[in-house]
Structure formats: C-alpha cells, structure tokens
Amino acid sequence: MKKSYRVKKEKDFKALFDAGHSVANRKFVVYCLDRNLPHFRVGLSVSKHLGNAVTRNRVKRRLRHALMDMSSQLEHQDFVVIARKGVEDLSYQDIYSNLVHVLKIAKLYKD
C-alpha cells in the first residue's frame, strides 16, 4: 500500500476519532471522516491484547491486503480500522468478509 493511502500522523488520527463517526461489528471498529480526497486513506490499529508482534503484524498484513483487493470499491474518505479480539484466528477470507460487512455499514464500500 502506497504511503499516500495511509493515515500516519497523530493529528489525523485525532481528527478521525474526534470528528468522525464510528461503526462496528464483532471483529472490527471503523472510524471514518470525509475529507474530499482523490483516494481513500486508511489507518490500522491492532492492540497488544491480540498477541505478540508476529501475530499483530500478520493481522495488519492481511488487513492491508484485503483493503488493496477492494480498493476500487472504497469511497474516497479517511478511515481507521481497529481490530478486535478474535480477529487473529480468522483466515484471510473471513477477515475480508468481516471487513466488507463493517465497511458497508459505514457506507464506505460500493457494490
């Protein structure tokens, strides 16, 4: 995923949490904020409660891969995906389907 597609700065995360709206399902929480950008930007958050560094990085890699696979269907907004407990045991297909579900609830996913 290119750097221009990532939310990295603390002020951007803070703006998303303060001014954005949130939706959730059992595996993910998504905060989103419309910024009128030419493409989407995403930030990933995986807590230490999910496991050691190897486990957290595996979850982040799978999330990034799923987001790039669905990039043509995503709205051009900033959003943060927070992984909840239990996502570390899911396969890529389950992560993809849960992510699509929560992004549809957030109205970030176009069919």
From Swiss-Prot:
<dbReference type="InterPro" id="IPR020568">
    <property type="entry name" value="Ribosomal_Su5_D2-typ_SF"/>
</dbReference>
<keyword id="KW-0378">Hydrolase</keyword>
<dbReference type="Pfam" id="PF00825">
    <property type="entry name" value="Ribonuclease_P"/>
</dbReference>
<keyword id="KW-0694">RNA-binding</keyword>
<comment type="similarity">
    <text>Belongs to the RnpA family.</text>
</comment>
<dbReference type="GO" id="GO:0000049">
    <property type="term" value="F:tRNA binding"/>
</dbReference>
<dbReference type="GO" id="GO:0042781">
    <property type="term" value="F:3'-tRNA processing endoribonuclease activity"/>
</dbReference>
<comment type="function">
    <text>RNaseP catalyzes the removal of the 5'-leader sequence from pre-tRNA to produce the mature 5'-terminus. It can also cleave other RNA substrates such as 4.5S RNA. The protein component plays an auxiliary but essential role in vivo by binding to the 5'-leader sequence and broadening the substrate specificity of the ribozyme.</text>
</comment>
<keyword id="KW-0255">Endonuclease</keyword>
<comment type="subunit">
    <text>Consists of a catalytic RNA component (M1 or rnpB) and a protein subunit.</text>
</comment>
<keyword id="KW-0540">Nuclease</keyword>
<dbReference type="GO" id="GO:0030677">
    <property type="term" value="C:ribonuclease P complex"/>
</dbReference>
<keyword id="KW-0819">tRNA processing</keyword>
<dbReference type="GO" id="GO:0004526">
    <property type="term" value="F:ribonuclease P activity"/>
</dbReference>
<dbReference type="InterPro" id="IPR014721">
    <property type="entry name" value="Ribsml_uS5_D2-typ_fold_subgr"/>
</dbReference>
<protein>
    <recommendedName>
        <fullName>Ribonuclease P protein component</fullName>
        <ecNumber>3.1.26.5</ecNumber>
    </recommendedName>
</protein>
<dbReference type="InterPro" id="IPR000100">
    <property type="entry name" value="RNase_P"/>
</dbReference>
<dbReference type="GO" id="GO:0001682">
    <property type="term" value="P:tRNA 5'-leader removal"/>
</dbReference>
<dbReference type="InterPro" id="IPR020539">
    <property type="entry name" value="RNase_P_CS"/>
</dbReference>
